[in-house]
């Protein structure tokens, strides 16, 4: 599904999702969140798509957060705020637990809800000009437990508190240092770098990737909620597969699998 503000396509086993609202730095409305859910569910069912890349149009922003021009309609009362928050939390959870690897390709501003979205992806790759911020403290906004926990888990408690309490922006180098992003590349090579990175993942054994993704999800749960039986089953499926037999033989024969 593609809409005016949410674009999607697939190429060589990689699904691409673009936030297409560049005149507002790709600020997101309820309609865009709804479209994202539909696209993700379509990509989930498509067996030819093995990796997902999310990015923002225009070359200035990944996603700058909620569309403030829509606040009177979407976040002007307690009821509408609860509805909006419920919607975004559902999207974040869908992305965080997505069964295929997800990559946020960040070029420019990654702010507020855009950062919340990015940290739900497995991998974040940004250009040198990228800027990150969580301006809630300047806007009197509140974030739920899950959003704050993700930042604590990724950045560490001290850096996450500094980041949230001051609402200061950090640059790409700082983001790399604190683990907010995994790769930092020049702007003119970003698209090709991410394309090759995604292709590398898509060419690896799908059962192993699926197992590692799901086991990673279980690791981040509270210990009492982890499905360790599922983890063992996923690992066993890998060893029982034809992919494993071929990979083992290729290794022994010193040839590509």
Task: Indicate where each model-derived feature is located.
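C-terminal alpha-helix plus adjacent terminal tail
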Residues: 1-12, 47, 59, 167-173, ...
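Crotonase-fold acyl-CoA enzyme core
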Residues: 93-206, 241, 246, 253
């Amino acid at each position: 599904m593609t809409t005016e503000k949410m674009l999607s396509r697939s190429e060589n086993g990689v699904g691409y999702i673009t936030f297409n609202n560049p005149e507002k730095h790709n600020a997101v409305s309820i309609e865009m969140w709804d479209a994202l859910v539909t696209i993700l569910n379509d990509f989930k069912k498509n067996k030819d798509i093995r990796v997902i890349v999310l990015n923002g149009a225009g070359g200035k922003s990944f996603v700058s957060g909620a569309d403030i021009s829509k606040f009177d309609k979407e976040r002007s009362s307690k009821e509408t705020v609860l509805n909006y928050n419920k919607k975004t939390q559902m999207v974040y959870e869908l992305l965080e637990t997505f069964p295929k690897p997800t990559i946020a390709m960040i070029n420019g501003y990654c702010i507020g809800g855009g950062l919340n979205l990015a940290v739900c992806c497995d991998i974040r790759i940004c250009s040198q000009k990228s800027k990150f911020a969580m301006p809630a403290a300047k806007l009197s906004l509140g974030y739920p437990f899950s959003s704050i926990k993700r930042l604590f888990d990724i950045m560490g408690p001290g850096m996450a508190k500094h980041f949230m309490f001051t609402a200061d922006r950090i640059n790409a180098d700082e983001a790399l240092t604190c683990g907010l992003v995994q790769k930092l590349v020049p702007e003119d090579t970003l698209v090709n770098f991410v394309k090759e990175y995604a292709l590398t993942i898509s060419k690896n054994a799908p059962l192993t990737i699926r197992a590692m993704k799901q086991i990673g999800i279980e690791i981040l749960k509270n210990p009492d909620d982890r499905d360790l039986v599922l983890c063992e089953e996923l690992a066993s499926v890998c060893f029982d597969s034809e992919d494993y037999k071929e990979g083992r033989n290729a290794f022994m024969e010193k040839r590509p699998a």
